[in-house]
């Protein structure tokens, strides 16, 4: 009779989990941030709040975000006027949008990843889906399984309400799935639509303005598996190690509350300082075994959480300005897309390196880090090893 240990050994893989393909998608509606303040105050019937509008414009200028993509169009808002009324009961209207559109946008990103991967969908064994909104039964994982026509035996994992650190979480979990299940190929999807957090401006709730200035919609997907078949698969990044940590006593610094008005988001002014002061502890934890302590010797896939956060992390760690260039570029072109953000940055980084002819997928460097952070205050840290091109 076969022993339990023999069964376990047969299930495990020898090599590290590897990203085999990346795909992204955005809504068609592109918003120019130079005109968005006027649009936002007009559609919410708030043009009379002139001082608040000027404050909003200054927020945009400081954010360095040039454009973003939003599912909500003026037509959709006219069809759902309660969404534009300050603190009006509107959860049902918002929910009806996101439970349909979050899986649909995720499908686009997943199809792009599957196309790049070049293998039949029947080889997908696991599905990991992450979104901040649209909690429902059946969940977005079920909806995406049906939309893509995946096998009914695909093993699904659904994660809601993680917020901005979710992109790191899905990679950490997919790493464990790939390395502990022989032949596993995990389809990972992060899809975010801000319809649930769109609120009319208010003098007493400036967090609304911060959210409108920072956030955009987008979806990203990766295929992850161990021991790639090099005849038909092209490995991009190996997931070497992963860690998650909570910054003590910071649960009130970033949080959201779901109610009949939708999801209200709160971001404390101390967040940039707290992230910058605590991120190095996470870096040391994952890079010490590799003997790496020079943070300029690695490539950076950072969460595009906002200009102030990036500025303070750069200053605290003594990073060269170019280390966060790709993260800043993604932020300027898409805004903060919550869990999908770091995967957009990873995709942009490997594309840039390919164009510039580097020997690896990122800046010619071998080692790198992916960092995401969000409610909790939670920090996810992934050590990446770039595969030679």
UniProtKB/Swiss-Prot annotation:
SUPFAM superfamilies: Thiolase-like. Gene3D superfamilies: 3.40.47.10. The gene is CHSF. Disulfide bonds: none annotated. Belongs to the thiolase-like superfamily. Chalcone/stilbene synthases family. The primary product of this enzyme is 4,2',4',6'-tetrahydroxychalcone (also termed naringenin-chalcone or chalcone) which can under specific conditions spontaneously isomerize into naringenin. Pathway: Secondary metabolite biosynthesis; flavonoid biosynthesis. Keywords: Acyltransferase, Flavonoid biosynthesis, Transferase. The active site is at 164. It comes from the Eukaryota. It catalyses: (E)-4-coumaroyl-CoA + 3 malonyl-CoA + 3 H(+) = 2',4,4',6'-tetrahydroxychalcone + 3 CO2 + 4 CoA. This is Chalcone synthase F. CHSF does not appear to be pseudogene, but expression of this gene could not be detected in various floral tissues nor in seedlings after illumination with UV light. The keyword Transcription does not apply. The keyword Transferase applies. It is an enzyme of class 2 (transferase). One of its GO terms (biological process) is flavonoid biosynthetic process. Its EC number is 2.3.1.74. GO terms for molecular function: naringenin-chalcone synthase activity.
């Amino acid at each position: 009779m076969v022993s339990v240990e023999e069964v376990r050994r047969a299930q495990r893989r020898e090599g590290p989990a590897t990203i085999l393909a990346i795909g992204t998608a955005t809504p068609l509606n592109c918003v120019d941030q130079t005109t968005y303040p006027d649009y936002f105050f007009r559609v919410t019937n708030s043009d009379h709040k002139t001082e608040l509008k000027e404050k909003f414009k200054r927020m945009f200028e400081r954010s360095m975000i040039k454009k973003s993509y939003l599912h909500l169009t003026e037509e959709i808002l006219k069809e759902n006027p309660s969404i534009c009324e300050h603190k009006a009961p509107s959860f049902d209207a918002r929910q009806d949008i996101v439970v349909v559109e979050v899986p649909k946008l995720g499908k686009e990103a997943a199809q792009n990843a599957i196309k790049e991967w070049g293998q039949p969908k029947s080889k997908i064994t696991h599905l990991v889906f992450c979104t901040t909104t649209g909690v429902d039964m059946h969940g977005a994982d079920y909806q995406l399984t049906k939309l893509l026509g995946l096998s009914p035996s695909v093993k699904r994992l659904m994660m809601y309400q993680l917020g901005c650190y979710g992109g790191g979480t899905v990679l950490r979990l997919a790493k464990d799935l790939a390395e502990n299940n022989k032949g596993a190929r995990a389809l990972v999807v992060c899809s975010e639509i801000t319809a649930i957090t769109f609120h009319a401006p208010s003098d007493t709730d400036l967090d609304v303005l911060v959210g409108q200035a920072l956030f955009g919609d987008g979806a990203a997907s990766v295929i992850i598996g161990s021991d790639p078949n090099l005849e038909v698969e092209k490995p991009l990044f190996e997931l070497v190690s992963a860690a998650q940590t909570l910054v003590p006593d910071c649960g009130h610094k970033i949080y959201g509350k779901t109610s009949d008005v939708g999801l209200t988001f709160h971001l404390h002014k101390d967040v940039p300082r707290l992230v910058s002061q605590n991120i190095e502890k996470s870096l040391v934890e994952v890079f010490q075994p590799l003997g790496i302590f020079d943070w300029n010797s690695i490539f950076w896939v950072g969460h595009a959480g906002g200009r102030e956060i990036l500025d303070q992390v750069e200053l605290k760690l003594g990073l060269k300005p170019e280390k966060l260039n790709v993260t800043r570029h993604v932020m300027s072109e898409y805004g903060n897309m919550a869990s999908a953000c770091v995967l957009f940055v990873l995709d942009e980084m490997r594309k840039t390196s390919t164009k510039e002819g580097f020997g690896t997928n990122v800046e010619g460097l071998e080692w790198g880090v992916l960092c995401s952070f969000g409610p909790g205050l939670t920090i996810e840290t992934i050590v990446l090893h770039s595969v030679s091109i």
